[in-house]
């Protein structure tokens, strides 16, 4: 996921790919694909991509306007849950080094996860500033599910069936009143604009002219991804 998005976006924008494996970083900087994907290999050798790779996550995030998070979230059968620890490590570092950056999760995550992250950071900001009210700090996070096939990831980004971007929305009902207030404290005043910006970046890199773009709440976007995975698994 990460390599295909990096390749797609680097057609028109400066992109820094971050990895913890030196061999992969060296391969990307030598214009060789670290994964088996015919289109990525072709683009690396034939296109003038604005792409470089680094092991220094802190430095990369400090310079970024947008951080796309494609960390692994392997399913933990013992806990019966996705392991989101790597995603959270990235978010923690971005918030520390560049709190104004827009973050977009591309990893597969549980339904309700991004909403819980908003609540978690709202509480953290309140605790750090020792207040029960809103702080001046904002948390800019979106979720954009991917629908990619193995070894065809870049092709599926170049010719996407649809683009979906989830951004924070308030849930209806008295049970969610307090949660909505906390999320309102930290969410960007331009969350929908952020979602439209990221969707436009994906469209800009695609080769399809007529791509369906859908905007929805983060929880709905998470559900769409998991339902799509379930459908494909049952369609063997």
Per-segment meaning from a language model:
Residues 1-31:
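NAD(P)+-binding Rossmann beta1-loop-alpha1 motif at the extreme N-terminus of oxidoreductases
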Residues 13, 63-64, 160-161:
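Short, well-ordered alpha-helix to beta-strand connector turns
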Residues 39-65, 95, 134:
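A structured beta-alpha segment of the ubiquitous adenosine-cofactor-binding alpha/beta core
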Residues 65-75, 159:
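Gly-rich Lys/Arg/Thr-decorated short loops/hinges at beta-loop-alpha junctions or inter-strand turns
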Residues 67-69, 105, 165:
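Redox-cofactor binding/interface segments in oxidoreductases and associated redox assembly factors
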Residues 71-73, 108, 168-169:
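Short glycine-/small-residue-rich Rossmann-like dinucleotide-binding loops
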Residues 75-150:
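Rossmann-like NAD(P)(H) cofactor-binding subdomain of soluble oxidoreductases
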Residues 120-144, 148-236:
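Internal alpha-helical scaffold of NAD(P)-dependent oxidoreductase catalytic cores
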């Amino acid at each position: 996921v990460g390599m295909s998005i990096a390749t797609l976006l680097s057609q028109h924008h400066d992109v820094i790919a971050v990895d913890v494996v030196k061999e992969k970083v060296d391969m990307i900087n030598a214009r060789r694909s670290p994964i088996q994907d015919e289109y990525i290999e072709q683009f690396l050798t034939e296109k003038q991509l604005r792409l470089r790779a680094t092991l220094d996550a802190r430095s990369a995030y400090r310079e970024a306007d947008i951080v796309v998070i494609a960390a692994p979230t392997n399913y933990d059968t013992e806990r019966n849950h996705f392991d989101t620890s790597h995603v959270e490590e990235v978010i923690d570092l971005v918030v520390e080094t560049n709190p104004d950056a827009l973050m977009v999760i591309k990893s597969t995550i549980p339904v309700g996860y991004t909403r819980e992250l908003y609540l978690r950071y709202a509480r953290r900001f309140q605790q750090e500033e020792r207040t029960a009210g809103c702080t001046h700090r904002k948390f800019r996070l979106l979720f954009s599910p991917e629908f990619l096939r193995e070894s065809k990831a870049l092709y599926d980004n170049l010719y996407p069936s649809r683009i979906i971007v989830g951004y924070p929305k308030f849930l209806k009902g008295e049970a969610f009143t307090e949660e909505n207030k906390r999320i309102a404290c930290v969410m960007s005043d331009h969350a929908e604009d952020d979602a439209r910006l990221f969707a436009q970046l994906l469209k800009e890199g695609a080769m399809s002219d007529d791509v369906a773009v859908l905007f929805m709440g983060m929880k709905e976007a998470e559900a769409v991804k998991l339902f799509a995975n379930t459908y494909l698994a049952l369609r063997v």
